[in-house]
Each structure stands twice: as structure tokens, then as C-alpha cells.
Amino acid sequence: MIERETSNTFHLASKYEPAGDQPAAIAELVDGVKGGEKAQILLGATGTGKTFTISNVIQEVNKPTLVIAHNKTLAGQLYGEFKEFFPDNAVEYFVSYYDYYQPEAYVPSSDTYIEKDSSINDEIDKLRHSATSSLLERNDVIVVASVSCIFGLGDPREYSQQVVSLRVGMEMDRNELLKSLVDIQFERNDIDFQRGRFRVRGDVVEIFPASRDEHALRVEFFGDEIDRIREVDALTGEIVGETEHVAIFPATHFVTNEEHMEHAISQIQEELEARLKVLRSENKLLEAQRLEQRTNYDIEMMREMGYTSGIENYSRHMDGRQEGEPPYTLLDFFPDDFLLVIDESHVTMPQIRGMYNGDRARKQMLVDYGFRLPSALDNRPLRLEEFEQHVNQIVYVSATPGPYEMEQTETVVQQIIRPTGLLDPEVEIRPIMGQIDDLVGEIHERIEKDQRVFVTTLTKKMAEDLTDYFKELGLKVKYLHSDIKTLERTEIIRDLRLGEFDILIGINLLREGIDVPEVSLIAILDADKEGFLRSERSLVQTMGRAARNAEGKVIMYADKITDSMQRAMDETARRRAIQEAYNEEHGIEPKTIIKEIRDLISISKTADKDETVVQLDKSYKDLSRQEKADLLMKLEREMKDAAKALDFETAATLRDTILELKAAK
């Protein structure tokens, strides 16, 4: 068992000082946390620096913090930002370590059993181990995670009790160390030295911890005493440092000692016998035979190796839990007094709420047909109510908080002011009758000012027809939809900014996260047709596209004002009034964002995310054959570097770009 270091404090390193209403938001959130408030909401408009605000809160309250994002890409970006803000503290990354994952499943209609198949990303596995070991060693830890953090993980008490602690001068037999390493799932391999392995050379044992990627440990013995512990480069063997003490954490999160393993196996056998009786009494002889054969094989592997593929399905017995008890998760590795931040909570909370039911349905089929014991159902994600029980104090972060968050707290901390002084756009409603002719007049006004226009429609057909009609009128227009490939989409956006055309028509432009400061008008056609594309949140997000321009304006064409429209307009007007008052008080003149236009291939999936950029000196079709080959090699290198750096959005963009460029040859 190791002791957690609690004296470390968070230190925020930034050249920026809180500005606008950031200081007030920080102070209110900090007071809430220190005052013991269970839940708070940070309602921050796009572009107001919500991550910087949360970083200041973390520094002030000085609590271990878990930040949950709704996908790996966003988690990776937040991880990068927090690493920059807290270079001296432990900023960790915890997401699903599968590059590819096909869960175990059974389809009764075709009698098809699908075996679990997966590809584990070694780099992410290392980072997961780094996260759990940091949480057990120190207090100044920020873990950025995806929703996968609510899935079952090993017992943190067992995990910490299995830590092998080594000190210089400690009496220990070399073979005793080797046995201890094997017990915590390290593998001996004197040739292929990788994470989770060790090798032996006389009185020297070299250990490659699961949480590291470059430096291994060299433990030198003198008789039955540890004489020296050094850090070495795992590839070259070069000595990079020396230490007096080191803690070696298990190579897997599902680890248990021999005594617990035997007890777990006896419980598995008891459950197997009881389940076989049930299946045979129901005349399910095939299912009984299948279950007996599979389970006995797993038991034999656990006895001989201490591990088996799919051991997580027996986690209830390994952890000593009762039927129905929640599994251990990453949240159990945190001390009781931790801070939880839910980013983009209006998307993340529904994900957390829905995880359990989908997992349960698949596993129930495996149990019913004899592929797994009923205890496999307890290898699962947390239910929402179980997740809530783990929460000490929580901050929901969103520009458009969902109903769940609003039910949890009345404390809504607003962050409306942008550092640029830009306002939320003016919103106007006009009748649907004659909407196109009216829009054409507005477009001409914008073209005279060298500004651009977004038009959102409800259907792809309408977008195409409107594009054709505008072209007949001599307007320069293009349309954007999901069928357009990444490369073509980004070229369209670039051409819009360059003024090669003036109007971009789309169906769900907010999903593209388009950031074009030149856009001063957004026209929302058929705004009164209730649905996902015209919900309050979608409308607020769409209106936000015009908040990059000092003359930003939104026109909604509608014959009636729906509840969603009214709420979206009220919220936008409320924010605009706050921003105007602040600007007047501080003498700030809103200025359109000046953003360099490059010849580039880029994609930005949400408004708050940075653009992913690949620079091209000239159009691809104008390159020579050798230049094309060189470019593709360069992009492939950048793709691999981005993946290694966990910048998955960049890597995915580069992958798509490479495929499209190859197809364009």
C-alpha cells in the first residue's frame, strides 16, 4: 500500500489574466466549491474561454479533478490545453484504449456467435496506467476522460496493495522480486523489452513500468540487498537518472493476489454449478455444455496464469462484490473530496445516462444462451444514479445546458463577455411569404460590403434547388451537406472566405462548426418547423456563427414564433444586452475577428475546437508527380505524429485528406 502525497498544489502557468466576466465567474464557482455546493453550471457563450475559467477554479480550490468530455477528440484537445496550463502538475488522459473494438455478442436469429475482437492502442493503455498511478501517488492531478471512465475497472484497493515498493538498501532476494513482478502480471522477456515486461541479467533486473513509454528501471542487487535503482533509456540503455525509491504498479488494472484468486475461482465454480442446474432443468443442454466448457477453460487459465481473456466478466467475484453492486471505475481511484467537471454537459450527460441499457441488452443475450455466467452482467458501466452517488462536487459546462443539469442546481454562473468585445447577433423575424426575394435583397447589401452569408434550410433538396435558383440570378453561391467529402468541404469554406463566392447554403451548418468571421448574415429558412434542426439549442448554436462579425445579424423566416424560437431569441437578446452594457462601461468597440486566410485543408467539428490545419503551397492538381508523392509522404508522417500525440482529430483529418488526394490522382 502506498501513501498519497497531499502537499502538492496546482500552479496555473499562463500569460493571460482573467478578463471580461471571467474573474466574476471564477470567484463565484470557487465560492460555491469552497462553500460545499454540490452542483453548479458554468453557462458560457462560445469563445468566452471556459477552459481557462475552469483552470483558474482548479488552481483556487486545489482539488484532484476529473474532466469528462463526450468523445476522444474533445478529450484530447482538453488534455492538451490543461497540459499547457498546468506544466508542473499531473495532467492525465483516460479514454477507451481500443483502436478497434467488436464486443462479444450472440445473434439468436442466425445462431451467430461473434467473438470479442479488439485492437489495443499501446500509447493510450500507458496513459490510462499513468492516470491511475498518479491518482494513488499524489493530490495535484487532473484527469481528462471520455465517458468510458464509468465502465468497470479493477478494485483500486487491490491495485494499490499490489504495488511493489523498492528502496535502496532494502533487503530483498532477487528471485523474490521476480515472483512479485509476475504476481502483478509483468511478463519476463529478456529479448523483446516492452511496457509491462522485465528482463534479468545476473544481479541486475530491468523493469519497464506499464505507465511509461521511454524510461525503464534498472534495479541492481548486491547479495540480498538493493544496491542501486537507476532510470535508463529503454531503447539505448543509457542512464538518465538515479532514485532512492520507486513504486511499481500492476501491469493490468484487473489484478488480485493468490488468496483472493482462489476464493474468486471457488465462487465462480459455485455459480457455474447453480447455473448449469437451471439450464438443464429448462432442457437447454447445448447452452449448459457450452457454458461448462467455456467457464472451466477460463478457470484453468486463471489458476495457471493468474489471468484469462475476458477476465473482466468475472470481476464481480474478483472484487468480492454482491450481485447488482456497482463496479469499481476510475471514479473510485479519486479521493472522496474531488471535483468533477462535465464538458459540453448537454451532450455528455445523455451519454452517461444511456450507457447502461445498451450494454445490458447485449450481455443478457450471452447469458441466456450459455456463453457467459449471469455474473457477467455486473461487468458494466455505472447507472446514472450510481454515477450521481460518486459525485462529490460537480460543475456542468455548456453554452446550452440541458434539462437534466438545470434540475440539479439553481446555481448558474454566466460567462457571456468575449475578450474581443463581440456581441451576440441581432435577431429579426420575417414572414415566410416572399422569403427568398427578401433574402436576395439582404444578400446584395452584404455583397456590397464584401461580407458573406450563411443560409440554412431543412432539406438537402431545398438546399440544391435554392442554390440553382441563386445561380440563375447571377449570385455566386455553393451549398454544403454531409455527402461532400472533407477535402471538398474545406476548400468550399476557404473559397467563401476568399470571396470566390458569397453565399453558403447548408442544412445543419452548426454541426460543421464553421468559423468564418466574414459572415455577417445568417438566414434561417422555415424557422418555425419544430424539430432537431430548429430546437432551442440548435438555433442558439446556429446564431452563434454570426458572432464573429461586428455587424452580425440573424434573420429567421417564420409565420409563427415557436417556443424554441422564443427561448433562443430571448437567450441571445439577454446575452447581447449584457455584452453591450459591459462594452459601454469599459469603452470597448466590438471588432470583427481578423483571421488569416491560408491555402489550406482544415476541419473543425465544433465551434469551440481549434482548426486542424495542413498547409499546402499550391493547388494539388497543379503539383508534379514527384511533388504529389512527397506531399503524401509528408501527410502520412504528420498523421502518425498526430496519432502518437493523441490529436485524433488531426490524425483523422489527415487520413481522410490522404485518401481523397490518392483518389484524385
Swiss-Prot record:
Residues 31-414 form the Helicase ATP-binding domain. Transmembrane segments: none annotated. GO terms for biological process: nucleotide-excision repair; SOS response. Pfam families: Helicase_C, ResIII, UVR, UvrB, UvrB_inter. Residues 629-664 form the UVR domain. GO terms for cellular component: cytoplasm; excinuclease repair complex. Residues 435-601 form the Helicase C-terminal domain. ATP binds at G44, A45, T46, G47, T48, G49, K50, T51. Its main location: cytoplasm. GO terms for molecular function: ATP binding; ATP hydrolysis activity; DNA binding; excinuclease ABC activity. SUPFAM superfamilies: C-terminal UvrC-binding domain of UvrB (SSF46600), P-loop containing nucleoside triphosphate hydrolases (SSF52540). It comes from the Bacteria. It is found in: Cytoplasm. InterPro entries: Helicase/UvrB_N, Helicase_ATP-bd, Helicase_C-like, P-loop_NTPase, UVR_dom, UVR_dom_sf, UvrB, UvrB_inter. A motif (Beta-hairpin) lies at residues 97-120. Keywords: ATP-binding, Cytoplasm, DNA damage, DNA excision, DNA repair, Excision nuclease, Nucleotide-binding, SOS response. Belongs to the UvrB family. Forms a heterotetramer with UvrA during the search for lesions. Interacts with UvrC in an incision complex. The UvrABC repair system catalyzes the recognition and processing of DNA lesions. A damage recognition complex composed of 2 UvrA and 2 UvrB subunits scans DNA for abnormalities. Upon binding of the UvrA(2)B(2) complex to a putative damaged site, the DNA wraps around one UvrB monomer. DNA wrap is dependent on ATP binding by UvrB and probably causes local melting of the DNA helix, facilitating insertion of UvrB beta-hairpin between the DNA strands. Then UvrB probes one DNA strand for the presence of a lesion. HAMAP family: UvrB (MF_00204). The beta-hairpin motif is involved in DNA binding. This is UvrABC system protein B. The lineage of its organism: Bacteria, Bacillati, Bacillota, Bacilli, Lactobacillales.
